[in-house]
Amino acid sequence: MATKTELSPTARESKNAQDMQVDETLIPRKVPSLCSARYGIALVLHFCNFTTIAQNVIMNITMVAMVNSTSPQSQLNDSSEVLPVDSFGGLSKAPKSLPAKSSILGGQFAIWEKWGPPQERSRLCSIALSGMLLGCFTAILIGGFISETLGWPFVFYIFGGVGCVCCLLWFVVIYDDPVSYPWISTSEKEYIISSLKQQVGSSKQPLPIKAMLRSLPIWSICLGCFSHQWLVSTMVVYIPTYISSVYHVNIRDNGLLSALPFIVAWVIGMVGGYLADFLLTKKFRLITVRKIATILGSLPSSALIVSLPYLNSGYITATALLTLSCGLSTLCQSGIYINVLDIAPRYSSFLMGASRGFSSIAPVIVPTVSGFLLSQDPEFGWRNVFFLLFAVNLLGLLFYLIFGEADVQEWAKERKLTRL
C-alpha cells in the first residue's frame, strides 16, 4: 500500500524560514543586485507588462480618431462612462483581452516560483508589475499626440513594433530556472537555488483542488483582491466623472492630468516593494509585512475617496487626492497580490489566475451598482457610492487580516509516495 509522507521531516522546525525570514545557515551570502540575472528578468517582465497594457490602452484612445476619420458628422450621442479596469489600474479595453492578461500574470508567477528568492520577492514582483502602470502613463500621455500628428495608424505601428521587440527579448532572455540560464554567475545560481529549496520541489503533483477550496487563506486572498479591485474600479471609472460633474472640469481631455495618477502609482509601487523587503531584513514576519502593505494600499486610498464630497476646495485639490489615492493603492502589489507565492509557491501561477478571475467580478458589478445609486439619489448619490466603496474595501481587508497567512500550506508542500 502507499502512504504519503513529508519530504522534509524538519519542516515544522523551520517556521521562521517558512515565514521567509532569512536563515543564514540555509541561504548563502546575498549576491549583488546590480547586473544580476534575476533583476534582468524583472526588467524584461516590466517591459512585457508595459507593452501589454499600453497596447490595450491605445485601442481605446485611437478608437475615437478611427471613428471620426471614417464616419460622417452626426448628432452627438456620447457617454462619460468607460470600461472597467484591472487589479493594478490598467484599463480593460475589451472582454477578450482579460483572459490573455490573466495568463500573462499567471505565467510571471510561474517564473518567480523558480527565480524569486523569498527575501527579495516583493521588490522583484513590484518591479515587474509596475510596468503596467508605466504602460498606462505612456499610452495616455503620447497616444493622442501621435494620433493627431502622425495619424492613428502610426499608433499601432509604434506600439506594435514595441511588442515585437518585447517578444524577441523574451525569447532570448527568459529561461525556466537558474540552472538552465546561460548568463548567470555561479554564486547567484547557488543563492537562488538555496533560497528556494525549502519551497519548490522538482516533482510534479496534481492540483489539490479540494484543499484549495477549503483553504481560508486562499479565500482571504480572493476576497481581498475583490474588494481592492472594487476600490480601483470605482477610482478610475467614476472619479473622473465625479470631478467633471462637480467641478465641471474634464480631466480626460488633459493628457497630463489623466496620466499623472499612473506615474505616481508606478513610483510608489516600486518603492513599496523595496520597503517590504527592507522590513524583512529587520526580522519582521512575512505575514506582518504582507498585511501592512495591504492595509496601506487599501485604507488610505478608500478614505481619501470618501473625503472627496466634503471638500470645499477646487478641482486641483480633488485631483491631487485622486492621484495620491491611486498611488497608494499600488502598495498592495507587495501585499495581497503576491501572497500566493508565500502560501503555495508550487501552485502560485494557478492561484494567481484563480484569484484574479474571482476579483474580476468587481469591475462588472461596480458600474451597475454605482449607476443605480446615482440614479436613485442625485443629491447624495456620490456619497453613497464612495461609502459603499469604503465598506466593501474594509470588509475584504478585515477578512484578509483575520485569515491571511504566509506559511507554506500543508497541501502545497512536496510529498512523495513510499511503498510499505
UniProtKB/Swiss-Prot annotation:
InterPro entries: MFS (IPR011701), MFS_dom (IPR020846), MFS_Na/Anion_cotransporter (IPR050382), MFS_trans_sf (IPR036259), Na-dep_P-transpt_4_prd (IPR017373). Pfam families: MFS_1. Keywords: Cell membrane, Endoplasmic reticulum, Glycoprotein, Ion transport, Membrane, Sodium, Sodium transport, Symport, Transmembrane, Transmembrane helix, Transport. The keyword Transmembrane applies. Glycans are attached at N49, N60, N68, N77. The chain crosses the membrane at residues 126-146, 154-174, 218-238, 256-276, 292-314, 319-341, 357-377, 385-405. SUPFAM superfamilies: MFS general substrate transporter (SSF103473). GO terms for cellular component: apical plasma membrane; brush border membrane; cytoplasm; endoplasmic reticulum membrane; perinuclear region of cytoplasm; plasma membrane. Residues 1-21 are annotated as: Disordered. GO terms for biological process: glucose-6-phosphate transport; monoatomic ion transmembrane transport; organic anion transport; phosphate ion transport; sodium ion transport; urate metabolic process; urate transport; xenobiotic detoxification by transmembrane export across the plasma membrane. One of its GO terms (molecular function) is toxin transmembrane transporter activity. Expressed in the liver and kidney. It is detected in proximal tubules in renal cortex as well as some tubules and glomeruli, with highest expression at the apical side of proximal tubules (at protein level). It comes from the Eukaryota. Belongs to the major facilitator superfamily. Sodium/anion cotransporter family. This is Sodium-dependent phosphate transport protein 4. The lineage of its organism: Eukaryota, Metazoa, Chordata, Craniata, Vertebrata.
